[in-house]
Amino acid sequence: MAPQSAVDRAAMAQAAQDIEQSANAIRGMQNQLASAKDQLRSHWEGDASMAFEAVFNRFNEDFSRVLKALDGMHESLVQTRITYEAREEAAQQSVNRVQALLNG
């Protein structure tokens, strides 16, 4: 017997929404941190300030990679759901055609 597959489209949609909300919250935090860093740097000069800037920039790059990954997961979930629904609809139409032929 072939393995069966079940897809919970509502759960898939909820997961996509949760990921999008999380990414938006993280973007907000990233913007707040950048603003706080800019404010701090406006009153701070010297080698320590420049070292902090370099570390912050690396941290911000990592932050951006996380956001890119979240955006990718969101897009994949959305596209997978769209593809699944289209295939499910096509399969249902095929079943309906066969049923119509059998019913004469």
Curated annotation (Swiss-Prot):
GO cellular component: extracellular region
SUPFAM superfamilies in alphabetical order: EsxAB dimer-like
The organism's place on the tree of life at top rank: Bacteria
Annotated localization: Secreted
Function: May help regulate assembly and function of the type VII secretion system (T7SS). Binds to EccC and induces its multimerization. May serve as a chaperone for EsxA.
Subunit structure: In isolation forms a homodimer. Forms a tight 1:1 complex with EsxA. Forms a complex with EsxA and EccC, probably wholly mediated by EsxB; binds in a pocket in the third FtsK (ATPase) domain of EccC (residues 1163-1208).
Name this protein carries in UniProt: ESAT-6-like protein
Species: Thermomonospora curvata (strain ATCC 19995 / DSM 43183 / JCM 3096 / KCTC 9072 / NBRC 15933 / NCIMB 10081 / Henssen B9)
